[in-house]
Every structure is written in structure tokens, then in C-alpha cells.
Amino acid sequence: MKRLLLLRHAKSDWDSGAATDHERPLAPRGTNAARAIGRFMAVTGVIPDHAITSSAVRARTTLELAMEAGGWTCPVDTTRALYEAGAHNVLEVVGDCSDTDDAVLIVGHQPTWGGIVELLTGASLRMATGTLVGIDLPVESWGWVRPGLGELAFVIPPRLLTDGSLDLG
């Protein structure tokens, strides 16, 4: 059994003055959400064996803050391929993951993240910024992952963690 974790980058700062969309940083609300997701992952034991992030500043920063706040670490690959990837492109990235990794976290962007959830599970959802989704895949090899094969394990929008709705002790 493999578990794919999809994390949409946290809320970005549209007024930052960044020269390009790729360089847009997180907003203060996004910083708080990324840290809350990281702590949630630590408390619940949802720690990836490996992470792959879009090279966009907001995606990389989301992952860095989550790891720091949660006190967990794993090998990280950064790729521009996830920046404008479609759902099928993400599926190719997933298929290239090492079979020694049982849980892989991929950090990226909407609408692709909603598309990969639907492609793998059939579930239609709009992923708000900072949302973490877990998809269980009944395979031994990442290369065997195919559309429709996944089961939605959980959806954690950051507001559950930042507004007191979910108490993590």
C-alpha cells in the first residue's frame, strides 16, 4: 500500500510586488497555515518518506515551513515540472517515485491538484490554498498507479487547524 499526499501551496501574497508569478511569496495567513499543516502532520504521524515540490517560491516555502513547524524531515526534490503540470504529468512524476518510499508528499498548485484527486479517486473537490489530501493506493510500486485506483483517505483544509475546529492538543 502506498499513500500519496498532495499539498496545495498555502495562501500567497498577490500584492508582494514579485516580478513573476513563479516568485510570488506566501502571505502571512499562508505562513500560519503552512506551519499548522506541518504540526498536524507531525501529531498525526502523516510524515512522508520523500517530498517533491514545485519550484515556485510559494510551494517551496509551504513545504519548508511545514517541515520546520512539524519538526520532521525527509528527502526533498524540487522541480519546475510541477509548476504548470497537468494531472497526467503529475501521475508521471508519481510513477517515477522510488518503491522504497511508502508515503510521498507532492506540493503544488490548483487546478492541477483537484484534477489529480479526481483522476485517482473520482472525487471532485476544490482544494483551497494550504489543503492537505491523502490518497491511499493499493499498489506495491508507484509505477503501477493508474487513474481510478486511489481511495480518498482524508482532506484537511488549513482552516480546520487555524480556527480551532480541530484540536491537536
Region locations from a protein language model:
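Short, flexible active-site-adjacent loop segments at beta-strand->alpha-helix junctions, enriched
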Residues: 10, 57, 82, 110-111, ...
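Domain-level recognition of soluble alpha/beta enzyme cores
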Residues: 123-161
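Non-DNA-binding regulatory cores of transcription-related proteins
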Residues: 96-131, 136-139
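Conserved ATP-dependent adenylate/AMP-binding module captured primarily in the ANL superfamily
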Residues: 90-94
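Short active-site-adjacent structural elements
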Residues: 15, 114-115, 143
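Active-site-proximal alpha-helix that buttresses catalytic centers in soluble enzyme cores
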Residues: 2-3, 7-80, 85, 89, ...
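A generic structural signal for short beta-strands and their flanking turns/coil linkers
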Residues: 22, 74, 102, 129-131, ...
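Short, glycine- and charge-enriched coil/turn segments that flank and shape catalytic ligand pockets
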Residues: 18, 100, 144-146
